[in-house]
Regions:
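Intrinsically disordered, Pro/Ser/Thr-rich cytosolic linker and juxtamembrane tail regions that serve as
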Residues: 1-176
Length: 176
């Protein structure tokens, strides 16, 4: 339909943050690369406490899609969307899986969780900068719901999105 193809052409950028407190057990941000690293933390005082990514989303992107893209962008091993499709969990049930949720912080609201099926755009108090993507440009990233974004696309009224580890009884399946 014309509407859904137009929705995929309209994009906006979010700022997504991951704090070191939301890394799986025995992981830390590498002091040089910033990537999550498994093992014993080095005895360095200046380990990064957070990492940020800018993601350009299709207008109709869901919270679950952002969580999946965040897991990939931050290179989190064995991580899945909390409340997402359990088919993959059943096929790989022998491995512990960290489940992640998405929270939002804005000037008008304290941090609060977002439902995985909800649209990201619905979380905004004020609409973000919506940009049409030139469909004549033959780039693979146009086919995806999520693509890399840039800081310049973030407005001062835009909220901060936070990737959080699910903090409940099934935080990590298979881990006692």
């Amino acid at each position: 339909s014309t509407t859904s193809s137009q929705d995929k052409q309209l994009r906006f950028t979010i700022q997504l943050v991951l704090y070191d407190t939301d890394l799986p057990d025995n992981m830390f941000f590498h002091p040089t690369t910033g990537n999550p690293t498994r093992g014993t933390k080095p005895l360095i005082q200046d380990l990064p406490s957070e990492q940020r990514r800018f993601m350009r989303l299709a207008k109709n992107a869901t919270v679950a899609e952002v969580i999946e893209a965040g897991i990939e962008a931050f290179q989190l091993p064995d991580a899945v969307v909390d409340g997402g499709d359990d088919v993959e969990d059943r096929t790989r049930f022998s491995r512990p899986r960290c489940k992640y949720v998405l929270h939002i912080q804005s000037a008008s609201h304290n941090e609060q969780p977002l439902h995985p099926a909800s649209k990201v755009l619905a979380a905004y108090d004020t609409l973000p900068l919506l940009q049409f993507v030139d469909t004549d440009v033959k780039r693979k990233s146009l086919d995806f719901t999520v693509a890399p974004g840039v800081m310049d696309d973030i407005l001062s009224t835009d909220p901060l999105f936070v990737l959080r580890i699910a903090r409940d009884k099934y935080k990590q399946e298979g881990v006692v």
